[in-house]
UniProtKB/Swiss-Prot annotation:
It is found in: Cytoplasm. Its main location: cytoplasm. It is an enzyme of class 2 (transferase). This is NAD kinase. Keywords: ATP-binding, Cytoplasm, Kinase, NAD, NADP, Nucleotide-binding, Transferase. It catalyses: NAD(+) + ATP = ADP + NADP(+) + H(+). InterPro entries: ATP-NAD_kinase_N, ATP-NAD_kinase_PpnK-typ_C, NAD/diacylglycerol_kinase_sf, NADK. Its EC number is 2.7.1.23. Its cofactor is a divalent metal cation. The active site is at D85 (proton acceptor).
Length: 303
């Protein structure tokens, strides 16, 4: 990933891969079909002169090398994901800020991030190798957790960051600030801070709005608020937001892209802003976001 360029130039760019480059694989671990397809993809790429690596935290695919070192990950020119959106988000985490584009094939249920059909896998990969695909930037979210003024954790997310009560029996009382000004204080099961990419995930299920991927916004959506007036809010993504638990005994879980990262207490302040990194997503040149909404979510379907 690289310094965010979407403010100046949010247009797609052609993806060109040099021969004999390195390509990484991330696959859905518990799906036999994904494991089988990963082997076939590895062989397909090797026949075309590419070095293929299995990315960390998964069993090494036959015929590939394990990406064990920082250099292995740094040298990747493309990552291919075989799975669902959860697998795609795992690939984003594994890249840890690298500007490596991801090409996703859906082997899950919804497949909003893994937008390409697994049935078209080899045709799409061939088009990618021939330079017929494009990469499009998606904004990301950055958060840091302060305790007594000191940073104790930092995270980057493609979809969302969530503060939720988890298994706690009582609602959490959360104060939200924008540029140090109080926005709201609400009792709820939690709050979602979503990027435009994440607006169609947990945010949508919680009643939040869909945001076009190029929208320079965050959406903050309460989860089951104990209030008739608490509603989702859109904020410009050049603003800094902060969240604090009100009450000395309050605790909550902090979740990044679906993975629990840490526990929050009343001593913590969560500060959220736009990440300095963009994520690069591989798409066909004629890809249409609204077609994807209709296909995956039946958006605007009158039937």
């Amino acid at each position: 990933m690289k310094k965010s360029s979407m403010d100046k130039e949010h247009k797609q760019s052609k993806l060109v891969l040099k021969e004999n480059g390195s390509i990484g694989l991330v696959y859905r671990l518990e799906t036999a079909q994904a494991v089988s397809l990963a082997k076939k993809v590895a062989e397909f790429l090797k026949e075309r002169g590419f070095e293929v690596f299995t990315c960390p935290d998964q069993k090494v695919v036959a015929g590939t090398k394990a990406a064990k070192t920082k250099k292995h990950m740094d040298d990747l020119k493309l990552v291919i994901v075989l799975g669902g959106d959860g697998t795609y988000l795992r690939a984003v985490r594994l890249l840890e800020g690298r500007s490596v584009p991801i090409l996703g094939f859906n082997m899950g249920s919804l497949g909003f991030l893994t937008a390409h059909s697994a049935d078209s896998c080899f045709d799409i990969i061939e088009k990618t190798l021939e330079g017929k695909m494009v990469q499009r930037p998606r904004s990301m979210i950055y958060s840091k957790i302060l305790r007594k003024g000191k940073v104790r954790a930092e995270y980057h997310a493609l979809n969302d960051m969530v503060i939720e009560r988890g298994s706690m029996s009582q609602l959490i009382n959360t104060a939200i600030y924008s540029e140090k000004f109080l926005v709201s204080q609400v009792k709820a099961d939690g709050f979602i801070v979503a990027s435009p990419s994440g607006s169609t995930a947990y945010n949508l299920a919680a009643g939040g709005p869909i945001c076009h991927p190029e929208s320079p916004v965050f959406v903050v959506t309460p989860v089951a608020p104990h209030s008739l007036t608490s509603r989702p809010l859109l904020f410009p993504d050049d603003r800094e937001l902060s969240f604090r638990l009100e009450g000395k005994t309050q605790k909550a879980h902090f979740i990044v892209d679906g993975q629990k990262m840490t526990e929050l207490t009343a001593d913590d302040e969560v500060i959220v802003s736009r990440s300095c990194y963009d994520h690069w997503m591989v798409r066909e040149a004629n890809h249409n976001y609204f077609h994807l909404l209709r296909e995956k979510l039946k958006f605007g379907d009158r039937n």
